[in-house]
Amino acid sequence: MLKEENTQEILHDLGEQEILNRLRKYMDYGQIDDDTALIKSYKKELIINTDMLVEDVHFSEITTNPNHIGWKAVATNLSDLACSGLEEVIGITVGLSAPSSTPWSWVDGVYTGIKAALNKFGGKLLGGDCSNGKQKTLCITALGTKGPLNLHRSNARPGDYLITSGPHGLSRLGLSLLLSDPITKSINVPNLLKEHAIKAHQEPQPPIKALQTLLKCKPYAMPWNAAATDSSDGLLEAIESLCRSSNCTAVVDHKNLPKHADWPSGKQWNDWCLEGGEDFELVVSLPPNWAKAWLKAMPCTKAIGRMKEGPAKAMWSNGETIQKAMDTKFEHF
């Protein structure tokens, strides 16, 4: 079809078959020819996760370009696989829904980001589906093989160390910076912190390296069991989910909140650290010997508290229950 110069191709003009034909370059030869994806049989257990990214809920074109959207779609799913004991990424399928007026360049950018993330973290684009819709939506299903670690939220035990694999609040700060939020304009945020925060929001890193280190430093005679989740919905929610599943109390040391070295002080900044969301760090409850080995092997990890017998809740070390700041808590609905 001939196009006038400077006129963008839109999905309505291309049609489904041409869209699928253009997406072939992101997959292995023949992968898209059939309605199913053939995966070779594995003797190991499979772990599978499905996540959605919805425009104006999980991303905005004001703050996130198409490449970043594709990257983020992969990273969110692989983060969930990592906190379930991922050994190797097999691949993903992609369900795409978008208005027919969507430019092809947007779709191409998203799949470029998807491919870049898979190239870095492993796995292939196995297939998927596309449809016309009122809102841009990506639905990703990720598949991987499970390693020897049995990571379940219900595995936390009294006496465990509560550890996270990295700092929190960066993604929320990055979003604020991209939106020119008055909060971030009222304080001198160091340039290095700005760079880290914006990258954390636009190109999150699933905690695969942290998981691999956790695996390597397990004491020899210790069982392969630990409690873990990721902090995609915020650090506090991650801690509370471990408490609920394990029926334990988490005692958190306020002085040990996992913050970037240049993180400002103040209640708002503590709230972002606790509840900003989309940090994608491992939050793990580990027996003391294993915890100490992981802390030594990976300097970016931080012990933020202990688990003890008691009701399923998170509390400060002074005995006060950690209260949620509802205006900052990350919610899907």
From Swiss-Prot:
Which Gene Ontology BP terms does the record give? Answer: thiamine biosynthetic process; thiamine diphosphate biosynthetic process
From which domain of life does this come?
Bacteria
Name the positions where Mg(2+) 2 binds. Answer: D51, D80
Residues annotated for Mg(2+) 5 binding in this entry: D233
Binding-site residues, Mg(2+) 1 = T50, D51, D129
Which EC main class describes this enzyme?
A: transferase
Q: Which positions bind ATP?
A: Y111, G128, D129, R153, S232
Q: Tell me which residues bind substrate.
A: H58, E278, F330
- Give the record's family classification: Belongs to the thiamine-monophosphate kinase family.
Question: Per its record, how is this protein called by name?
Answer: Thiamine-monophosphate kinase
Q: What is the protein's species of origin?
A: Prochlorococcus marinus (strain SARG / CCMP1375 / SS120)
Please name the gene that encodes this protein.
thiL
